[in-house]
């Protein structure tokens, strides 16, 4: 096995901070996430990493919740990539269009290269009943998609899931094709799981499974949303669902991912599992 990684990066999923009482039934401790983030940053700052990515749900609700959680991120010395999850849109309707900018994102979906690897961030909130105000065409289209999934009896026909539109799918397809032409392996990241089948999965995720299999260069898809975590392999792609930081009163969860030519190493901290995933 190759001894030195191509690159290393940190992963955090679902801090879901809010100044709110715990939800004991789901074991979620919203206020504790700031201290958990600070603890995670203390560890990650001591590691040689190319960047740290947070896989959505920085907050549980309320626009003002962004201030303390983003202030905590100032303690992270590494480059940081943020993306929204469903809870990041639990804000006033007039703020919905500002969420991506509040997270410092260059666009709702985008890609970048590090260490010869192409990283792609997708936005599964695009087609959802929470990311656009009621009465807008995008909200109506999302409601129609959800109604169709409900009629089919789809297990992921939930108001707290979402999907991607045709424009974003075409962009993703073109991005993977360009990476393949350049000889780049790809890691795709999003909030919603795609595989194995689960009630938390992205609407229409089967299209992405098929696209990744056809592309042949997507080594991993990394996500949050399902706080208990999950793991699967479909074709040549690993699907890794990282555990949610907001869960449990005191136990933290985050990870360092190492990419090698022949494998992916996940070094889990706290509740997160360590894994070796052969390529």
Report residues per predicted region.
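N-terminal active-site segment of His-dependent metallophosphoesterases
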Residues: 1-67, 167
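Active-site neighborhood of phospho(di)ester-bond hydrolases with catalytic His/Asp-centered motifs
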Residues: 11-13, 52-57, 80-86, 122, ...
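Solvent-exposed loop/turn segments at secondary-structure junctions
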Residues: 15-18, 58-61, 86-90, 125-128, ...
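Short, solvent-exposed loop/turn segments at secondary-structure boundaries
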Residues: 23-25, 64-65, 198-202, 278-279
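Second-shell loop/turn segments in exported
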Residues: 27, 56-59, 158-162, 196
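Short, motif-level signal for alpha-helix interfacial/capping segments enriched in acidic residues
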Residues: 32-36, 200-216
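Short, high-confidence coil segments that cap the C-terminus of an alpha-helix
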Residues: 49, 183-184
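Extended active-site neighborhood of metal-dependent phosphoesterases/phosphodiesterases
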Residues: 63-182, 207-217, 232-267, 278
């Amino acid at each position: 096995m190759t001894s030195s990684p191509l690159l290393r990066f940190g992963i955090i999923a679902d801090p879901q901070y809010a100044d709110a009482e715990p939800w004991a039934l789901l074991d979620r401790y919203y206020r504790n996430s700031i201290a958990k983030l600070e603890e995670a940053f203390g560890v990650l700052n001591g590691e040689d990493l190319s960047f740290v990515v947070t896989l959505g749900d920085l907050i549980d609700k309320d626009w003002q919740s962004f201030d303390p959680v983003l202030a905590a991120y100032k303690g992270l010395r590494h480059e940081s990539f943020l993306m929204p999850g469903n809870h990041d849109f639990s804000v006033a309707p007039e703020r919905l269009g500002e969420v991506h900018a509040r997270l410092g994102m260059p666009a709702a979906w985008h890609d970048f290269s590090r260490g010869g690897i192409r990283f792609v961030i997708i936005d599964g909130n695009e087609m959802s009943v929470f990311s656009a105000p009621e009465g807008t065409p995008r909200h109506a289209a999302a409601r129609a998609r959800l109604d169709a999934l409900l009629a089919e009896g789809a297990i992921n026909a939930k108001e707290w899931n979402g999907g991607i539109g045709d424009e974003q799918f075409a962009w993703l397809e073109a991005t993977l094709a360009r990476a393949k032409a350049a000889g780049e392996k790809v890691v795709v990241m999003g909030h919603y799981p795609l595989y194995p089948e689960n009630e938390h999965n992205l609407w229409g995720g089967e299209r992405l499974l098929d696209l990744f299999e056809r592309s042949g260069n997507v080594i991993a898809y990394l996500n949050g949303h399902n706080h208990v975590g999950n793991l699967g392999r479909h074709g040549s792609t690993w699907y890794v669902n990282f555990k949610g930081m907001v869960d449990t009163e005191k136990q933290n969860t985050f990870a360092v991912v190492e990419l090698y030519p022949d494998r992916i190493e996940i070094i889990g901290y706290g509740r997160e599992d360590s894994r070796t995933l052969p390529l």
